[in-house]
């Protein structure tokens, strides 16, 4: 029984798994008469990579990472969804990519997303949805079963782990209600970490740690950045939102509501590597980092979306299931806004507001906050040590002494947290 085998080993370290071996075991099980499990060799992985105006220096390594996975390339359908507003240069890059990877995958599909379509905002969601609709048409034309096609969405700088598609395919096959699951890898922002400025490196590593910790708490996990879902489920719910800035986190709530609470996100504990923020000048980089974090913070718009549904008469998700999720969503965005300045300055607020305060709280609060900061410093030291092990190999053009800056950069943590996280 593949379900029993899965449950017996789910607590083991998944990074040590040879998922090709597990898929081979599932193939043998699927040959048993009466076994209703999907046959692994009938599963296809479709990868939708969206692009705006990125150059080949960004796009080619990302496609190569998909090519180099351990999953058979003849069962990978690659879709490049690129924006019409990216101009002629993007059009040329798309054609060059298709020519370069001709014959590598089952198919390499180019989908140009038109500009100014009715009912769409300018963003990733409309591009993904437009590409997803074309993918569904392609699958119908090729007479493939949509229930056996797993769709992974990627940004143009995303480079997946070699085991990612095998891992997703295995998790997909062993779940009886597989259409009601999404599969979430760990986003690690280290592709270009050696070239990034110190403040951006601090933010990139901090976000990477947050994603690692999130993967350890599957009951709280939501869609973020790159993720995978079955094509049949995506088509049933009209793919991704075309009206929200943050389409990934919003996809969790859309899926939860559409499937009436029968929806979960499965952690895929292997990385998909992404870029840290780099722009032209230092000022442009600082601004671009702010814009990226602001975009993520637009997930706060889900508070109104979820709250409205929670208290709606049309709600089909059990109240006791949805209410705790709503409160965690609300708490997360509020905490994000105030935590850094409160920890830094909150202990002194009572005395600053009332210099004559003699109460025990006003007197002891600075000491309490000081203890918290001391414990936080210990955690920061651990973070520094672990982050050094996460670094990719130093490029030849980067000097050896720059590794020292990977430690010194953390003195910027308080400033970065206050400026960018509040």
Q: Where does each model-flagged region fall?
A:
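Loop-to-transmembrane boundary segments
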Residues: 26-59, 121, 314-340, 406-420
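Membrane-embedded multi-pass helical conduit in multi-pass membrane proteins
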Residues: 1, 328-422
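Internal catalytic domains of large membrane-associated glycosyltransferases
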Residues: 2-301
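C-terminal catalytic/acceptor-binding lobe
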Residues: 256-339, 346-360, 417
């Amino acid at each position: 029984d593949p379900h029993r085998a899965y449950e017996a080993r789910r607590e083991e370290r998944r990074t040590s798994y040879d998922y090709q071996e597990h898929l081979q075991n599932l193939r043998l099980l699927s040959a048993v008469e009466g076994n209703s499990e999907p046959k692994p060799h009938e599963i296809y992985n479709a990868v939708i990579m969206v692009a705006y105006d990125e150059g080949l220096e960004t796009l080619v390594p990302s496609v190569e990472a998909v090519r180099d996975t351990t999953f058979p390339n003849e069962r990978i359908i690659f879709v490049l969804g690129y924006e019409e507003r990216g101009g002629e240069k993007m059009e040329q890059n798309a054609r060059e990519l298709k020519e370069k990877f001709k014959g590598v995958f089952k198919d390499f599909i180019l989908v140009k997303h038109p500009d100014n379509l009715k009912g769409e905002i300018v963003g990733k969601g409309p591009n993904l949805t437009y590409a997803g609709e074309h993918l569904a048409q392609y699958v119908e034309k090729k007479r493939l079963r949509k229930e056996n096609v797993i769709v992974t969405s990627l940004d143009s700088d995303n480079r997946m782990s070699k085991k990612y598609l095998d891992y997703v395919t295995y998790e997909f096959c062993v779940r009886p209600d597989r259409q009601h699951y999404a599969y979430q890898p760990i986003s690690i922002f280290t592709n270009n970490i050696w070239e990034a400025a110190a403040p951006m490196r601090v933010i990139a590593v901090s976000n990477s740690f947050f994603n690692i910790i999130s993967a350890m708490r599957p009951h709280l996990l939501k869609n973020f950045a790159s993720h995978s879902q079955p094509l049949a489920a995506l088509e049933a719910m009209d793919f991704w939102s075309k009206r929200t800035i943050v389409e990934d986190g919003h996809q969790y709530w859309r899926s939860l509501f559409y499937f009436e609470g029968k929806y979960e996100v499965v952690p895929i504990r292997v990385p998909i590597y992404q870029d840290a923020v780099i722009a032209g000048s230092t000022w442009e980089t600082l601004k671009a980092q702010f814009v990226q974090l602001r975009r993520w913070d637009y997930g706060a718009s889900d508070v109104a979306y979820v709250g409205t549904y929670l208290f709606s008469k049309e709600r089909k998700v059990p109240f006791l299931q949805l209410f705790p999720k709503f409160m965690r969503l609300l708490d997360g965005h509020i905490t994000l806004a105030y935590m850094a300045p409160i920890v830094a300055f909150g202990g002194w607020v009572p005395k600053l507001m009332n210099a004559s305060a003699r109460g025990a709280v006003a007197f002891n609060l600075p000491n309490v906050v000081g203890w918290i900061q001391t414990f936080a410093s210990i955690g920061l030291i651990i973070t520094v040590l672990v982050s050094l092990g996460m670094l990719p190999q130093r490029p030849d053009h980067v000097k050896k002494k720059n590794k020292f800056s990977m430690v010194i950069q953390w003195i910027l943590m308080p400033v970065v947290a206050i400026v960018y996280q509040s």
